[in-house]
Amino acid sequence: MLQALLIFVLQIIYVPILTIRTILLVKNQTRSAAAVGLLEGAIYIVSLGIVFQDLSNWMNIVAYVIGFSAGLLLGGYIENKLAIGYITYQVSLLDRCNELVDELRHSGFGVTVFEGEGINSIRYRLDIVAKRSREKELLEIINEIAPKAFMSSYEIRSFKGGYLTKAMKKRALMKKKDHHVS
């Protein structure tokens, strides 16, 4: 019974680590992924080693499977809380909605406005890049000012240039100056 509990706990730890390592790889953070992979591999070997010691012990196998499933749930939760990376929202509007554009820019979001031809009239599209950790804030602003907007989103693997890059460099310089002054 203690072995089954140990296997379950190891899986609860292992699978979220596996999830984080996978996300780091997808986000092109290979060195961090490799470091996390060391821990992941060690836990995997220990856990599976206990299961393979006695394949007739069905409690160990069930603990492994249930722990894996519970670990997936926990890994998904942790990933949402960490919100690693960036996201782009494309917001389609019937009018230019300067109020929304101004509020987004005032809040520190990079916004590009496009004018396009819809089936019956001119339409406007906003391309907004944000840290995933600020996605909720972004959606609250959009929903408050333009609740009927059509939105689609996708995650960004990498980017270069633009407002967001300048803002990040500016923040990094400010931190360096603050650090040297302290």
Swiss-Prot record:
- Which UniProt keywords are listed? Cell membrane, Membrane, Transmembrane, Transmembrane helix
Q: Does the keyword Cell membrane apply?
A: yes
Transmembrane listed as a keyword: yes
**Where is it mostly found?**
membrane
Q: Which residues cross the membrane?
A: 6-26, 32-52, 58-78
Q: Topologically, how does it sit relative to the membrane?
A: Multi-pass membrane protein
The compartments listed are: Cell membrane
A Gene Ontology cellular component where this protein is annotated is: plasma membrane
Note the InterPro entries from the entry.
DUF2179, DUF5698, UPF0316
Q: Belongs to which family?
A: Belongs to the UPF0316 family.
Mind telling me what this protein is named?
UPF0316 protein BA_3420/GBAA_3420/BAS3170
Q: List the taxonomic lineage.
A: Bacteria, Bacillati, Bacillota, Bacilli, Bacillales
